């Protein structure tokens, strides 16, 4: 699926407020799904947000470090398949949009999380384990 904005604008935090962009070095389902849920809840009506997997950040500025690290191409299909299962753990059902983008010769997984229509959303603390308590996540600031 095509992104609603340019990947370089996201990496440079241009045209989109920085609190709507989250960079992740690697695939960590629990952390990523907490963020997906928070963007879907979007109580400030900012338009949701973007999670970009495969990007290191500068600890001082929060900006993307270039060239990006990327996600190994052999892991992308597996991650997308995992997401299909994890998406069903969000209550009520919510489907983020994903796009694979090439930057600096490497691939990134971009997860676009528009504001959901059936807020509030909750997700288990650990989407990879059964029987974990669900929480509502929101973004602030």
Describe each region flagged by the PLM.
Residues 1-141:
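Conserved N-terminal catalytic/coupling substructures associated with nucleotide/phosphate chemistry
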């Amino acid at each position: 699926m095509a992104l609603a904005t340019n990947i370089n604008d996201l990496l440079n935090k241009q045209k989109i407020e920085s609190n709507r962009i989250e960079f992740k070095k690697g695939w960590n389902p629990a952390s990523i799904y907490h963020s997906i849920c928070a963007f879907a809840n979007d109580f400030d009506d900012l338009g949701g947000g973007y999670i970009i997997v495969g990007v290191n950040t500068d600890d001082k500025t929060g900006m993307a470090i270039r060239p990006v690290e990327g996600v190994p191409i052999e892991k992308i299909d597996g991650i997308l398949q995992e997401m299909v299962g994890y998406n069903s753990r969000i209550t009520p059902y919510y489907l983020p949009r994903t796009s694979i983008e090439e930057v600096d010769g490497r691939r990134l997984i971009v997860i676009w999380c528009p504001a959901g229509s059936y807020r509030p959303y909750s997700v288990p603390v650990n989407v990879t384990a059964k029987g974990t308590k669900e929480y509502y996540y929101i973004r602030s600031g």
